[in-house]
Amino acid sequence: MNHQKYIRNFSIIAHIDHGKSTLADRLIEHCGGLQAREMSQQVLDSMDIEKERGITIKAQTVRLVYKAKDGNNYYLNLMDTPGHVDFAYEVSRSLAACEGSLLVVDSTQGVEAQTLANVYQAIENDHEIVLVLNKLDLPASEPEQVKQQIEDIIGIDTSEAVLISAKSGIGIDLVLEAIVNKLPPPKESSSDILKALLVDSWYDPYLGVVILVRVIDGYLRKNMRIKMMATNSVYTVENVGYFTPKKHISDVLHAGEIGFFTAAIKQVADCKVGDTITDEKKPCEQALPGFKPNLPVVFCGLYPTDSSEFEHLKDSLAKLRLNDASFEYEMESSSALGVGFRCGFLGLLHLEIIQERLSREFDLDLITTAPSVVYKIHMRDGENLEIHNPADLPDLQKIESMEEPWIKATIMVPDEFLGAVLSLCTEKRGMQLDHSYIANRAKIIYKLPLNEIVYDFYDRLKSCSKGYASFEWQMDVYEPSELVKLGILVNAEVVDALSTIVHRSRAEQRGRALCVRLKDLIPRQQIDIAIQASIGSRIIARETIKALRKDVLSKCYGGDISRKRKLLEKQKAGKKRMRQYGNIEIPQSAFIAALKIGDE
């Protein structure tokens, strides 16, 4: 392997749909990573969902060999990163493994909210940034205006920006030359003792866990005994290699390189992302600074529509967990829905993708309960609790105070839609922190409660701005709030699966909306059915499903009135008994429709 000065480790960062994965395809094609017949669109997006939705979920890596104009061969390690806010953690891991970044901006759309978030992360990691303006072939492309926008908002020098069209392949050689000439090589190795950063891990059915590493010092070779510093686990390396993007086995990974190894590790949970890997015999003294753990922020219950599918759901979740350590689940039961799982996600897109993968890859039909967030409860007896399931909320008399999570949201929107976006944020209990204009776009920063975001905020933001607004958020603080548990009763029976924790000011509106929706969904019976929304013992909304009238006199043609009276009295007694003991069956379809996110 050549000297470190011929290695370049870089990641591609951009907002969704600005052309990251297409640019990665062109770079692979240009450097001969795959033959023309093996190329497909979005080579690095391996999941079907990634290709269909046009998003990157898992960060992917590939090593390219490029012969530069100076006559030398350079080894380029490319990390393709996700652009969606839910997967910002994947971005932070990729950035920590690299020295430079390609910032891709769509020259027809300009700077978006997620572009900003990723750029600031790259700057925090001391990255050298090469600006790439994409989609130059489109008639709406305005490179000069976008350059000015970038200088105004981010403050990066745009005089050496590379203008390309990733789709048609224009300017790809300029990007490669910029990578070689402007991005720095890895720092010289300061020691021969192995020190490597664990960047990612995933499960392979034949090899066990495959671990992606960035070697900082020393080298990693086959049959070495290595130690994970966070867990002190010791393993023997079985295979070492890199991706081109095909898997390529080699003998050794040197300092500065990015590659993978396998070591007969059974579970992804044993490999903590951000951990330091070192030699068991000669361990390094100090571990690398890792990443802050990625904690789930949105929770919901997943239940099989058929209880016989429970074991299949359990196995399916375990398989998904092998490749997605940020996804958490635990068993729970509900009187209405049976046995299922309480699951934790990074955000709503993450929730949707897990749901879609369960139905598509494992053929499961699921009911999803209303999403909730983690609340902090301070009890009168001094105990502090963290809950995310409304069923776990203690009696309000025992609670001293409750805190809910708030987020800091950055929204970029064309100024003609600003009014609609501001009124949406105000409706969601938002507080405006900042408001500025860049050309004809407004950048607003709001503080918003997370439990208002998880319902339908993103969908409504897109619809009130005709799809032009972009949105990025990060957790901010927990603040005291007047929260209540909104319960739904059907025929005086509490339906636990429909319970939610809401702000007192929104309780009546949401309770009424749920009652109205259930009235349309639950089939009529022979008795009146009361659907009620309650806070504790107080009813705040009610709808009634009127009874079906069964005509018991239809077979009485004339005859004695006492005969008719006897039949009517019998029906009356039956209805009384039904009201007393009858359970109202709520069909699964009613649950699914009532719990639909975004139909508020």
Curated annotation (Swiss-Prot):
Domain tr-type G: 5-187
GO biological process, one term: positive regulation of translation
Single GO MF annotation: GTP binding
Domain of life: Bacteria
PROSITE patterns attached to this UniProt entry: G_TR_1, G_TR_2
Bilayer topology term: Peripheral membrane protein
Cysteine disulfide partners in this protein: none
Binding positions for GTP per the UniProt entry: 17-22, 134-137
Classification via Pfam families: EFG_C (PF00679), GTP_EFTU (PF00009), GTP_EFTU_D2 (PF03144), LepA_C (PF06421)
Enzyme superclass (EC): hydrolase
Catalytic activity, as annotated: GTP + H2O = GDP + phosphate + H(+)
A GO CC term assigned to this protein in UniProt: plasma membrane
EC annotation from Swiss-Prot or TrEMBL: 3.6.5.n1
Cell location: Cell inner membrane
InterPro entries per record: EF-4, EFG_III/V, EFG_V-like, EFTu-like_2, G_TR_CS, LepA_C_sf, LepA_CTD, LepA_IV
Alphabetical list of SUPFAM superfamilies matching this protein: EF-G C-terminal domain-like, P-loop containing nucleoside triphosphate hydrolases
Keyword Protein biosynthesis included in the entry's annotation: yes
Keywords: Cell inner membrane, Cell membrane, GTP-binding, Hydrolase, Membrane, Nucleotide-binding, Protein biosynthesis
Family: Belongs to the TRAFAC class translation factor GTPase superfamily. Classic translation factor GTPase family. LepA subfamily.
Function: Required for accurate and efficient protein synthesis under certain stress conditions. May act as a fidelity factor of the translation reaction, by catalyzing a one-codon backward translocation of tRNAs on improperly translocated ribosomes. Back-translocation proceeds from a post-translocation (POST) complex to a pre-translocation (PRE) complex, thus giving elongation factor G a second chance to translocate the tRNAs correctly. Binds to ribosomes in a GTP-dependent manner.
Name of this chain's protein: Elongation factor 4
Organism: Rickettsia conorii (strain ATCC VR-613 / Malish 7)
